[in-house]
Amino acid sequence: MKIPSEFDPIRPFEPEELPAVYDRILADKQFQMVLAYLYPDVPVEAIAKKMHACKTNLEFQKTFCYPFLQRLVTELSLGCSMDAVNIDTRKRYTFVSNHRDIVLDSAFLDKLLMDVGFATTCEIAIGDNLLSQDWVRDLVRINKSFTVERALHSVEMLRASKRMSEYIHFAIAEKND
């Protein structure tokens, strides 16, 4: 699907962009330190190979995010579930949550959507104020997040809000991912 170019600065990465983004984050020293912490016995080269094998955002989520979240549930909680008996997994939905933990709450929602049989995960709005590192900005866009531009003056903020609103409408009405 061709996404209008005006959304390029805020939209999630598309599959054809992923290889270059993987290379960029894998070259980042701070990201390498995070990988060494999360995967102490796995060489960065092996992680890079596994990452490059992920041809879509969803494959990346299933390969890296889902196992990490499952480990959190298993080791640090009594469980995490979703009653989806009245939800048609073939339809699209808009989920709205509070501002408690933007990254973790939405990550668990993605995990639960996979658990109950949705073919894809959600796109997540995240403020640019939380994306101070380039590798973090890239990682959330791999993970299907779109950026809410916050650090703007009033006229710019109005334009950015309009663009974000148009992107959300586009994502709901036209994207099937």
Where are these regions (language model features)?
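Glycine-/small-residue-rich active-site loops that bind phosphorylated ligands and cofactors
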Residues: 100-102, 131-132, 153-156
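Charge-dense, low-complexity intrinsically disordered segments
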Residues: 55, 59, 151, 155-158
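Membrane-anchoring hydrophobic helices of lipid-metabolizing enzymes
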Residues: 1-93, 99-110, 114, 121, ...
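Carboxylate/His-rich catalytic cores and anion/metal-binding grooves
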Residues: 110, 119-132
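Conserved Motif II region of HX4D acyltransferases
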Residues: 90-97, 165-177
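Acidic/His-rich structured neighborhood in mature extracellular/periplasmic domains
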Residues: 150, 160-161, 165
